[in-house]
Each structure stands twice: as structure tokens, then as C-alpha cells.
Design a protein with these regions (language model features):
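Conserved bacterial/organellar gene-expression machines centered on ribosome-associated P-loop NTPases
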Residues: 136, 229-353, 374-379
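Conserved nucleotide-binding/hydrolysis modules and their immediate coupling elements
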Residues: 1-79
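Functional cores that coordinate and move charged inorganic groups
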Residues: 89, 109-227
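Glycine-rich, acidic loop segments that terminate in or are immediately followed by a histidine
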Residues: 33, 195, 200-215, 306-397
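Short amphipathic
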Residues: 3, 7-10, 166, 303-313
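A generic structural motif
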Residues: 18-20, 53-68, 125-130, 343-345, ...
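Active/ligand-binding-proximal structured segments within catalytic/core domains
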Residues: 25-41, 75-128, 373
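Short, hydrophobic/aliphatic alpha-helical segments
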Residues: 9-26, 78-91, 184-200, 349-366, ...
Length: 397
């Protein structure tokens, strides 16, 4: 049911929110790991639905802009109103929740895995599986997860019926082949995927589900990780799983085109490229070492009362490495400048570089600091770099 008529039985304000209760509702409240329905109530947006004090509360946006005008709350207790749910949102929840049921049932059947936690997030769903019923299994491998994924989709492809049954007493419900023991004694709802005699899954649940397993569409597992003695399964179901598959396939196609590779040899091409990258990094490392050593020797051989040189290509870390090579051989001061960032790196075995920066950089809007043998000053303009170095050189004469 997507639409209905209901009577307002209560309107209250709490924490700045307007909460409405009805004599009957088609809105599913948040619960059991599933998010609530959203939709319309008397023309107003329903943004949250929850159960409390044996009633269902609908949070509505009662101040909204309609046709360019701001309309205030016109809802009154006793009003007969139209209510409707956002069916796309409901069906999305149904697909995901039922997909989780089927997959949990397969984990239990194959490996004795008990679902101890379920979260339906915006980007993915998770279940926490505890291996309890079959002692021969002590971990969930990726191959095991792939088998569960396949078996889950096989159930979906069979388009088995999803049967919901209600029981007043625990004793009546316990006659079914339940995956998990019941947690309550009365007013029990059981959801079975497949025949009651031999279901793919059968468990107590208050959530929403499609009429058949085929409506789930598909299930895809993305990741398995250990978590607090259990195994957390990241997965998606329904249209979301399909759309995520499309997105990932698009990325895969882009990579194939960039690497001029087909799917079957994509990994080989990628690994070959990684080897080239590794080789290039190794060559660059040795080239930089040679350049740094050569620069350090040049500075040592041309040391005057002050030495200054600007670098456009070398990084700040490279320039710092040059400074390390100079340690113990600078009886004056060396200014090595990283031009792209207007950063002056000072090195000296005689003068206190940190003190020089602290006392003089701010004169030209610079900032920085450092130790006695090395320091840095950063400026906003190149002209301040030159003026700063001239000032220090004159100060040290």
C-alpha cells in the first residue's frame, strides 16, 4: 500500500520538531536495522518515523515553501488527511533488507555463521557473522564469501516467494525452521524466503520485504574483515548493487582504455606499469642523490661571507638534504631558496639560524623558525626573499 487516508490523533512539539500520530499508518518506523519510510502527510514532508510509548510518531516539516509562499502548519487533531510513502525509498529498503535475509541464511546454512549485527548504511550494508554452529570453520575467507554471494543470487534467480506470517504465541512460531531463536514470546512476525517446509531463510523480522526474492535483483559482496571476534561482511543489494556495479565497471573500462588492455590481461599490464614506475622512482632517487652531492660540493667550493642560490626544480626536502651534506663545513652562512614557495632555508655552523629568522623574517611579513644550525623563513613575495637575505648578510658583516 502506497497511499491511504488517516485521522490525526495527536500533534506535539519536541526539540523543535513537529510530531504527528495517526489512527492508522502505512509508514514503517525505524527499527531492526532498517531506516524508516519517508513521504507525505497532509501535504507536508515526513522526514522521520519512529515508535515510542506504543505509538508511531511521524516527524513532519510543517513550515515549508509552497508555490513561492511560506506556509505555516495547518494540521489539526481530528483532521482526515491523505498519507503517502516514497515508494522508491520503500522499495530500496525492501530490496536491501530481503537481500540481507537471504545472504544471512546462506552463511548459516553453509558455515554455521550467525548474524549478530546488521547495519543498513547509505553507501553499503554490513552484517557481522559469528561462526558458532560448525566448529570446522574458524574464519571467513574471500572464497567462502564468493560462494555465499553466488548461492544468494541463485536464490534470487529462482524468484522464491517471500512469505510473512504472524503468530500470537512463541509456541506456534517455533514450529518453523527458524535460523535464530526467538527473542520474544508474543505478537511474532516470521519472514520465510521460499517454502515454509524448506526455506532459503526463515527468521523473525518486523521489516519490509518484497513479494518475491526475484525483486531483490542482485547481491554483491565487497569486502570481508575480522571484527571483534566476528567477521564483518560489506555488501549491497538491489538497484544500489546494480548501480555500484555500473560505476565500478565504468572505472574498469577507463583503466582498460588507458592501459590499452582487455579485461583478461589488465592485471598483467598494471603490474608491468608498476614495475616501470618502481624503476623510474629508483632512477630518480639515485639522480637526486647525485645532484644533491654535486650541489653541496659546489657550495663548499664557492663559500663566501654568504652563499645564496635559488632552486626551481628541487623540492624543499631535497634542499634540506643539501644542507645536511653541508653540516660541519659552513663557517659563514648559506641561503638556499625554494623559489616556488618563496622559502629561504638557512644553514650555518657559526651563526644561530633560528635566531636570525625569528628576529628578522617578520620585518618583511615572513614567518618561520628553526634550530641553530638550520632554519627556514617563508615569504609572500619573491622581492621579500631577496631583501631578507640582503639584510642578514649586512647584519653578519
Amino acid at each position: 500500500m502506497k497511499e491511504a487516508t488517516a485521522k490525526i490523533t495527536g500533534i506535539s512539539e519536541k526539540d523543535g520538531k513537529t510530531l504527528v500520530t495517526l489512527d492508522q499508518t502505512i509508514f514503517f518506523p525505524t527499527g531492526g536495522g532498517q531506516s524508516c519510510d519517508v513521504g507525505k502527510l497532509g501535504g507536508y514532508d515526513v522526514v522521520d518515523v519512529f515508535e515510542a510509548d506504543d505509538d508511531i510518531f511521524h516527524e513532519v516539516c510543517t513550515t515549508q515553501v509552497l508555490d513561492g509562499d511560506r506556509e505555516q502548519n495547518s494540521l489539526q487533531i481530528g483532521d482526515e488527511i491523505e498519507i503517502s510513502i516514497d515508494w522508491a525509498h520503500r522499495f530500496d529498503n525492501m530490496q536491501r533488507h530481503c537481500g540481507e535475509h537471504i545472504m544471512s541464511g546462506i552463511f548459516f546454512e553453509l558455515y554455521g555463521g550467525v548474524n549478530r549485527g546488521f547495519h543498513m548504511g547509505e553507501d553499503y550494508m554490513t552484517i557481522d557473522i559469528s561462526l558458532e554452529e560448525k566448529p570446522e570453520f574458524n574464519k571467513i575467507t574471500w572464497e567462502m564469501a564468493k560462494e555465499v554471494e553466488l548461492r544468494t543470487n541463485m536464490v534470487i534467480w529462482q524468484n522464491l516467494p517471500v512469505i510473512t506470517r504472524h503468530f500470537d504465541k512463541r509456541e506456534e512460531a517455533e514450529n518453523l525452521p527458524l535460523r535464530k531463536a526467538l527473542a520474544f514470546d508474543e505478537d511474532i512476525t516470521i519472514v520465510c524466503v521460499g517454502s515454509v517446509d524448506n526455506p532459503a531463510d526463515c527468521v523473525a523480522c518486523c521489516g519490509t520485504h518484497p513479494a518475491t526474492a526475484g525483486q531483490v535483483g542482485m547481491v554483491k559482496i565487497y569486502k570481508v574483515e575480522s571484527n571483534k571476534g566476528m567477521f564483518r561482511i560489506y555488501f549491497e543489494a538491489g538497484e544500489r548493487a546494480f548501480r555500484q556495479y555500473q560505476e565500478r565497471f565504468d572505472v574498469l573500462t577507463i583503466l582498460e582504455n588507458k592501459l590499452s588492455a582487455g579485461f583478461s590481461d589488465l592485471m598483467d599490464k598494471y603490474e608491468a606499469q608498476q614495475e616501470k614506475v618502481k624503476e623510474s622512482k629508483n632512477q630518480l632517487y639515485h639522480l637526486k642523490k647525485a645532484v644533491i652531492k654535486k650541489e653541496a660540493e659546489e657550495i663548499k667550493n664557492n663559500m663566501r661571507p654568504a652563499f645564496a642560490k635559488k632552486y626551481d626544480i628541487l623540492s624543499i626536502n631535497d634542499i634540506l638534504d643539501i644542507g645536511k651534506e653541508l653540516q660541519g663545513s659552513i663557517d659563514t652562512i648559506a641561503f638556499l631558496v625554494h623559489s616556488p614557495s618563496n622559502t629561504v632555508l638557512l644553514f650555518s655552523d657559526k651563526h644561530d639560524c633560528g635566531k636570525l629568522v625569528k628576529e628578522n623574517a617578520s620585518i618583511y611579513g615572513g614567518k618561520g623558525g628553526g634550530r641553530k644550525q638550520s632554519a627556514r623563513a617563508i615569504f609572500t613575495k619573491e622581492e621579500y626573499v631577496d631583501t631578507f637575505m640582503d639584510l642578514i648578510e649586512k647584519h653578519l658583516r
